[in-house]
Amino acid sequence: MTYTYLHNKFLSIIPKYKNLIKPLSILIALSGGKDSLCLVKLIEDFNNTYNHFSRIEYIYIDHQWRSDSKQNIKHLLNYISITNNNTYIYQINKMEISEANMRNIRYQAIVRHAIQNSHDIIVTGHNQTDQVETFLLNLMRGTGLEGLSSLPYIRKITDQIQVIRPLIHINTGDVLWFCRKFNLPIWSDKTNFYYTNFRNRIRYELLPYLKEYFHPKIESNIINFLSLSSIENEYIKQNSIKLYLASRHSHYIAINYKIIKNQHLALQKRVLNIFFYHNFNKYVNSHILNQLIKMKYQRKLTIVWETLRIKIYKNWIYIQ
């Protein structure tokens, strides 16, 4: 078997996942594109050499948005069949919903399958260029620090399951070279060239423009920024969680604002967001958030937000 510099890079990445020290069952989420084929090749080569994973399975979610989706599935199954590992195909009824909502449905289906089939790890094919594109998309949508670093190297989603992205430090150019090197059968998805999709326009117009006229290493510069931001965001997140645990009521859905009001504004906002998300699985909007921060807490007050009645009295914020 021929080893390349991407094999070596992959081998250097895997040991960094601390929980990959024993035989594990992994579920590889496929998209059908070049990233998926590259990921399959790297993982199968790695396991053939080290026999590290006790079970490897593949999963593909078909949105049925494309007229050639069935042919794409046959093409993918034909390639995966050489691995002798199980592949699961889920089809979602064609719906007129946004790409973001469809991505969320796909994510839920993959996680549910992983739980039902006792997998330890979900592996995705996101690469470094995907991370840059996601950063630019989120930046234009006005996201905060948390949203800018939304594609972490590794993420724990349940007590038993983690998502890992072993290609996250490998760019699209390297992935394409790898596929050509090993003659991997890339399926050309015509929807990748529809400029009505913002991500495609970023990929084929904005990023080349930034490289040509602003900085040829714009991708690596953005990655460096994201790396630093991720460290700082993690520090703020950990301190926010500590503050939330110290300020929440032990019996009721309530939080003592007196404890957090002297903290930095960034911590105040984070703690309030944690309070609403932890109890109601909702992120409070900026208008309500600013109202709560600026309010005088010596008087009794009620704020109605969606189905919630937010009560404020004597430094306590509580929900009725």
UniProtKB/Swiss-Prot annotation:
Top-level EC class as recorded in UniProt: ligase
Entry binding sites for ATP: 31-36
GO molecular function, one term: tRNA(Ile)-lysidine synthase activity
Keywords recorded for this protein, A-Z: ATP-binding, Chloroplast, Ligase, Nucleotide-binding, Plastid, tRNA processing
Subcellular location per the Swiss-Prot or TrEMBL entry: Plastid, Chloroplast
GO annotation, cellular component aspect: chloroplast
Main location, first listed in the record: plastid
Pfam families reported in the protein's UniProt record: ATP_bind_3 (PF01171)
Any one biological process term the GO annotation gives: tRNA modification
Family of this protein: Belongs to the tRNA(Ile)-lysidine synthase family.
NCBIfam families assigned: lysidine_TilS_N
Function: Ligates lysine onto the cytidine present at position 34 of the AUA codon-specific tRNA(Ile) that contains the anticodon CAU, in an ATP-dependent manner. Cytidine is converted to lysidine, thus changing the amino acid specificity of the tRNA from methionine to isoleucine.
Protein name: tRNA(Ile)-lysidine synthase, chloroplastic
Native source species: Gracilaria tenuistipitata var. liui
